[in-house]
Amino acid sequence: IDEKFDDISTLKMINDAVFSDFDNDGDQDLIVVGEWMPVTFFENKDNKFYQKKIKGVSNINGWFQTITASDLDEDGSVDYIIGNWGKNNKFHPTKEKPLHIYADYFDDNSSFDIALSKVSKTGDLLPIRGKECSTQQTPFLGDKVKTFKEFATSTMPEIYGSKKLEKASHFE
């Protein structure tokens, strides 16, 4: 399709999309799903796609994997099934306490590194992975944080450095 889109810079890691006439005006609109992003709707107006916010859906980020369009209840309107990781994972993110991922070349080599973190009950940003796993991926951490106890009682900015975290791509 060589139609034009308005700003798509907010899209993150797209996993699936479906063309469907969600506004019932006779042309094919686009719905996009992905990780670290809300279900994103693009309304087709005169062969140009404009992002449209849908109340109750457009403000919820998820780990969306799939979308399917079908008239499931046979009432003449299109229904959508959206597959999301949901709560069946070891991280258990919530709207109040989301999972945070920082991604960058933390040890300045050619290998892209990720750091998983969550907010503690006291409001500190803490690593999810332990010292052993973290230092396997980013060896400089072994020199910076010497003991398991020190790692266990340190925050993400203390471990990785505030400047490195600010520079990194951040998903929540």
Where are these regions (language model features)?
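Blade-edge motifs of beta-propeller repeat domains
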Residues: 1-12, 43-62, 102-172
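Short, solvent-exposed loop/turn segments at the edges of secondary structure
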Residues: 12, 36, 62-64, 96
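Beta-propeller blade termini
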Residues: 13-22, 64-74, 83, 103-104
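Acidic carboxylate motifs that coordinate Ca2+ or other divalent cations, activating on Asp/Glu
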Residues: 25, 29, 75, 79, ...
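Hydrophobic beta-strand segments that make up the repeating blades of beta-propeller
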Residues: 29-34, 80-84
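Short consensus segments that form the blades of beta-propeller domains
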Residues: 32, 58, 89-95, 167-171
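Structural signal for beta-propeller blades
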Residues: 38-41
